[in-house]
C-alpha cells in the first residue's frame, strides 16, 4: 500500500439484516407501497433504464418493436429492483450507521427483513420468467447473472473489503445495455461491449465524487471506499484518469453510429473533462470543493450521451461499418 492510502478503522459489519430486530410493519397501504418502492431504489433504476433504450435502438439499427422495448424495460426494472432490494437486506447493518441511508425502509423498520428478502427473490425470479417469455433466454440469463453478481460479489464481498469495490462491482450497473442489446438480437456483439465499457469507466467518477462528499459516513460504517482510504488528491486524480478513459471509450462507437452521436460525445466529453480537471486542481490547491456537483453532472453527462445515441440510432444515420 502506497503512502497515498491510510488504514480504515475496523468495525464489525458482517451480520445480515435477517438477524435484525422484528420490524414495525407499515400500517397503511400507501406507507407500505412507499416502503417497497424505497427497497427497489427507483432513481437508480431510472438511470439504468435510460442506458437500455439507446442500446436497443442501436441494435435494431432504428426503432425496434415498441412491445419488445416495453417488455425489456419491465424485465430490467424487475431485475434491478431485485438486486437493489437484496442489497438493502445485506446492507441494513451499515445503512443504519450512515446518515445518508438511515431513512431506508429496513432501517426504519417499515418492512420486515424477511419480507424484503422474499420480495427481492420473487422479483429476481419474476424477471427471469418475464424476460424469457417476452424476449429471449439470453436476456433472462444475463439479468439473473447480474443480480447474483451484484448481491454476492459486490455487496457481500467487494464493497466491504477493497477500495476498488466500485470499479469491479460497478460492472453490474453496466449490464442493462448488454441485456437490451441481447433482447433485440439474441446475442452479444461488440457495440454492446463498447457501451458496457462506457458505463464501466463512468461509474468510478460518478461514485467516488459522491463518496468524497459522504466520506465520514462511509468511514463510520467501515466501508473502504477510495475517498476513505486514500488522500483527496489521489482520489481526484483517479477521477480524472477514469474520465479520460470514459471519454475516449465513447469514441469507439463512432464507426457504428453517425455524426450526431459522435459530435455530442466529443462535446459532452470535453465538458465533463473540464469539470473533472477543475475538481482535481481545487483539491491539489487545498481549496473547497463541490464533489456532489460533479456527481449530479455526471448523470447529466450520461443522459446527453445516451439521448444522442438514441436519436442517432432512431434516425438510422449513415454507418461507417462496424463488423457485426
Curated annotation (Swiss-Prot):
Pfam families per UniProt: UbiA
Pathway(s) of this molecule: Porphyrin-containing compound metabolism; heme O biosynthesis; heme O from protoheme: step 1/1
Chain segments annotated as transmembrane: 39-59, 63-83, 115-135, 137-157, 166-186, 192-212, 239-259, 260-280, 302-322
E.C. number(s) listed in UniProt: 2.5.1.141
Domain of life: Bacteria
Topology relative to the membrane: Multi-pass membrane protein
Catalytic activity: heme b + (2E,6E)-farnesyl diphosphate + H2O = Fe(II)-heme o + diphosphate
GO molecular function terms attached to this record: protoheme IX farnesyltransferase activity
Signal peptide: none
Keyword Nucleotide-binding: no
Gene Ontology BP term (one): heme O biosynthetic process
Keyword terms: Cell membrane, Heme biosynthesis, Membrane, Transferase, Transmembrane, Transmembrane helix
Localisation: Cell membrane
Record-linked InterPro entries: Protohaem_IX_farnesylTrfase, UbiA_prenyltransferase, UbiA_sf
Listed GO CC annotations: plasma membrane
Function description: Converts heme B (protoheme IX) to heme O by substitution of the vinyl group on carbon 2 of heme B porphyrin ring with a hydroxyethyl farnesyl side group.
Family, as annotated: Belongs to the UbiA prenyltransferase family. Protoheme IX farnesyltransferase subfamily.
Anything else known: Carbon 2 of the heme B porphyrin ring is defined according to the Fischer nomenclature.
The protein, known as: Protoheme IX farnesyltransferase 2
Gene: ctaB2
